[in-house]
Swiss-Prot record:
Species of the source: Arabidopsis thaliana
Record flagged with keyword Metal-binding: no
Protein name (database record): Small ubiquitin-related modifier 2
Annotated PROSITE patterns: UBIQUITIN_2
Phenotypic consequence of gene deletion: No visible phenotype.
Length: 103
């Protein structure tokens, strides 16, 4: 007798997922959220814990910027996945009025 698909699931593949948010300084903060929860909840909690403004941080998963309304389910995140928290970089303009043209 073979197992049903529900029986094949690992116990940890339930409604919750454990995620790690890693800052540029190497500091790691761990979260456990529902797979259907919008990531803005995790993002806000991270910013509160780090005492930084929400708009000053970019959150990346697999090199792609996350949007606050996305969920772990949408992104097919797995238990233990890592999100990078990066400070926004501003500036980068040319010095002395020089302009760069690409053709």
């Amino acid at each position: 007798m073979s197992a049903t698909p529900e029986e094949d699931k690992k116990p940890d593949q339930g409604a919750h997922i454990n995620l790690k948010v890693k800052g540029q300084d190497g500091n790691e903060v761990f979260f456990r959220i529902k797979r259907s929860t919008q990531l803005k909840k995790l993002m806000n909690a991270y910013c509160d814990r780090q005492s930084v403004d929400f708009n000053s941080i970019a959150f990346l998963f697999d090199g792609r910027r996350l949007r606050a309304e996305q969920t772990p389910d949408e992104l097919e995140m797995e238990d233990g996945d890592e999100i990078d928290a990066m400070l926004h970089q501003t500036g980068g303009g040319a010095k002395n009025g020089l302009k760069l043209f690409c053709f």
